[in-house]
C-alpha cells in the first residue's frame, strides 16, 4: 500500500475516533441534564406540597394537592 493510502486510512480512523468520542460526551451531558431536571422537579413538587399542607392546616383540613397552582383543601380527599 502506498504512503498516501496509509495516510488516508489513518485520517479516516482519526475522524471516526473523534466523532464517536463527541457523541459519547453529548449523551453523557444529556443524561446529566435529565437527572438535574428530575431533581429540580422533585424539589419544586416537595416545596409546593409543604405549602399546601401549611395552607390547609390553617383551615383545619387536609391538603388534597394542587389544582392550577392553588391548594385544594378538603376534610376527606377523594381519588
Curated annotation (Swiss-Prot):
<feature type="propeptide">
    <location>
        <begin position="21"/>
        <end position="44"/>
    </location>
</feature>
<dbReference type="GO" id="GO:0005576">
    <property type="term" value="C:extracellular region"/>
</dbReference>
<keyword id="KW-0732">Signal</keyword>
<dbReference type="GO" id="GO:0008200">
    <property type="term" value="F:ion channel inhibitor activity"/>
</dbReference>
<feature type="disulfide bond">
    <location>
        <begin position="52"/>
        <end position="64"/>
    </location>
</feature>
<keyword id="KW-0800">Toxin</keyword>
<keyword id="KW-0960">Knottin</keyword>
<dbReference type="Pfam" id="PF02950">
    <property type="entry name" value="Conotoxin"/>
</dbReference>
<comment type="similarity">
    <text>Belongs to the conotoxin O3 superfamily.</text>
</comment>
<dbReference type="InterPro" id="IPR004214">
    <property type="entry name" value="Conotoxin"/>
</dbReference>
<keyword id="KW-0528">Neurotoxin</keyword>
<feature type="signal peptide">
    <location>
        <begin position="1"/>
        <end position="20"/>
    </location>
</feature>
<feature type="modified residue" description="Leucine amide">
    <location>
        <position position="78"/>
    </location>
</feature>
<dbReference type="GO" id="GO:0090729">
    <property type="term" value="F:toxin activity"/>
</dbReference>
<keyword id="KW-0027">Amidation</keyword>
<keyword id="KW-1015">Disulfide bond</keyword>
<protein>
    <recommendedName>
        <fullName>Conotoxin ArMSGL-021</fullName>
    </recommendedName>
</protein>
<keyword id="KW-0964">Secreted</keyword>
<feature type="disulfide bond">
    <location>
        <begin position="63"/>
        <end position="77"/>
    </location>
</feature>
<keyword id="KW-0165">Cleavage on pair of basic residues</keyword>
<feature type="disulfide bond">
    <location>
        <begin position="56"/>
        <end position="73"/>
    </location>
</feature>
